[in-house]
Each structure stands twice: as C-alpha cells, then as structure tokens.
Amino acid sequence: IGMKYRSVYGSDNDTVEKVACFSRACALRNKLNMTTIGAFGGRGMGLTCGCADPSQFMREFGVDIDSRDSMDILKAAEEVTEEEIQDVKENLIKPYFQEMPPDDGCTERSIRLYLAVKKIIEKEKFDMYVIQSFPGLAEEYAASCFTQSMMLQQGIPTATLCDYNNVLTVFLLSNLTPDPVYYGDFQCIDKEKKVVKVIGDGACAPSLAG
C-alpha cells in the first residue's frame, strides 16, 4: 500500500532492541510532524545553520517556523513584575545554586528576559524555539544564557544563535529522556589526557553541573 516498513526476524535481545529503536524513531517522527519552531531574531554571529528554508523544514520534517522580532521579547520583559522576579529567585535559582547571583541590574534583566520568552512561547504554543542573542539582545539588554539554561532545565527544547539543526536535535533528545539536554560543540579531543572538550554559549541546565 506504499507505506515504508522494516522487517525484523528473531527473538534475541538485539532483535528486540532493533524493533524498539525503530518504534521510537517512528513515534518521534510522528511527534515532530506539525510542530512549530518559534524564531526570535535572525542568524546569530554568521552561523550557516542559523538560516533555514521554511519550505524545506515543512517538506522534510513537517515543522513550521514562526518568526518573531526581538522587540516582542523586550516589551514582554518590561511588563514583568517584581513578584515574578522574586518567585524565580526562590523557586528556580535558589534550589540549583550554592550562591545566589548578585542582586544587580544584570541579574534582573536576565530574569526578565527568561520570563518574557517563557510567556511568549506559552502564548504562541511553540513546541521549541531558537533565539539570536548575539548580536542583538545581548548587546542591548541581556545575554540569553540564563534563559536558555532554565528552559533546558524544564525540558523545553531550545537553541541559541538561531541554530535550527541544533534545536531539532534537542527536541528529539528531550523526547527520549526525562533528563535535561545539554547542547555543545566538540572543540578538541586530547587522546593522551583522555579529555574531550565541549564548548557552548553559556547555556547548561544547572542540574547537570557538579
């Protein structure tokens, strides 16, 4: 009838694992279909993967890209109340940090940015989102590192610098595990020291630290 399928024979553990893996892949593909990526800003720092063809994403993955200007975030950030800021400090920051961040303008703007983005993605029902951050918000208001870290901690798929390939990967991984996902790039592998160096942009779920 024209449907793609895979034939698997046997009852050993390897065969069962093949069936399980294929089933999970099918479920993920179906879940990815008809999802929406919220895109705040444009390509960050000249990244090639910061550009995406909406028609191709819809054709290949069934994913819609819905763009928003960064000004929407700034407007929402200005509307955040002091009570909301204190709630984040007590319930999101305090449980994960041994020392509270400085009580200054930078910290307040970072929290406001987080709350603004969270409100917008909930209002628009985005399934995942990308954000430019550099250049743009980070220069004019605050870096998105805290925002991204808290979103990853809560299992919300996201990527900075409008990296569309990255956010798709985070979405898939987030649906395969209950644990927070970390995204980073391999910088180097030191075989003698047996060390792999992975770099990111400051975004990491705090529960993964230590």
Language-model segments: residues:
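Cofactor- and metal-binding active-site motifs of prokaryotic enzymes
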Residues: 1-33, 45-46, 195-199
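Short, surface-exposed connector motifs at secondary-structure boundaries
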Residues: 2-4, 34-38, 151-154
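Conserved beta-strand scaffold positions in the cores of enzyme catalytic domains, especially
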Residues: 5-7, 65-67, 158
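Catalytic cores of large soluble enzymes that bind and process phosphate-bearing ligands
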Residues: 7, 11-14, 49, 102-105, ...
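Conserved beta-strand termini and adjacent loop/short-helix elements that scaffold enzyme active sites
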Residues: 8-10, 40, 68-71, 184-186
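A short acidic, often aromatic-flanked loop/helix-cap motif at beta-alpha or helix-coil junctions
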Residues: 11-17, 71-77, 189-191
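A charged, amphipathic alpha-helical module
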Residues: 26-142
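Anaerobic metallocofactor- and corrinoid-dependent redox/one-carbon enzyme cores
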Residues: 54-56, 60, 64, 109-210
